[in-house]
Amino acid sequence: MDKLVILKSIGGNFERGFQCSLSIATEGQPIDLKVLGALPAHHSLPEDYRTWQATCRNLGLRSRISGSGTVRKGATRSDCVRASEHLQEQLNRWLQSPSFVPIRDKLQEQLQPRDRVRLVLQVDDLALQQLPWHAWELLDRYHNIEIALASPTYQAVKQSPPCPKPMRVLAILGDASGIDIETDRVKS
């Protein structure tokens, strides 16, 4: 069965935490249920993300002396893997917070491993968007899941009215070699 799951953060930041809502619907149908929960403050998670990014960005760079005279070493693959594992561990620990349990429980209750799931994360906090949501351990049991980011605010786009007459296309194909077309260009 195709399911649409919308996880929305309602304001907040990593200093204060995030209020969240979860909506689940069968694809093409109205929302079946809505659950509220919260993610607590987690000051170090954005820094863990930046550390992982910086470590992997420096992957394979040679040691070099910076302007201050200190030697900076490039990161190794194992440094990058360690930073990635640490970030994933912190993310999953955060997503197991007691205040987020109602959302986790409802996901496990409503979704079956064989379901095709579209998980839409409606978040406005850039740092929250950048987290590796695909590494959420809860999602490992769903083999047919897509994760998408979306803005929590949106407006429907009006469709253009259809053309009253069918469109006609004229295409002239040819080769101008050997023909003096300069006089035609000047006249038009």
Where are these regions (language model features)?
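Glycine-rich phosphate/diphosphate-binding loop of Rossmann-like nucleotide-binding domains
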Residues: G178-D180
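Non-catalytic, solvent-exposed interaction/assembly segments
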Residues: M1-M167, I172
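Short helix-loop-beta junction
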Residues: R185-S188
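Active-site metal-binding loops of divalent metal-dependent hydrolases
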Residues: G174-A176
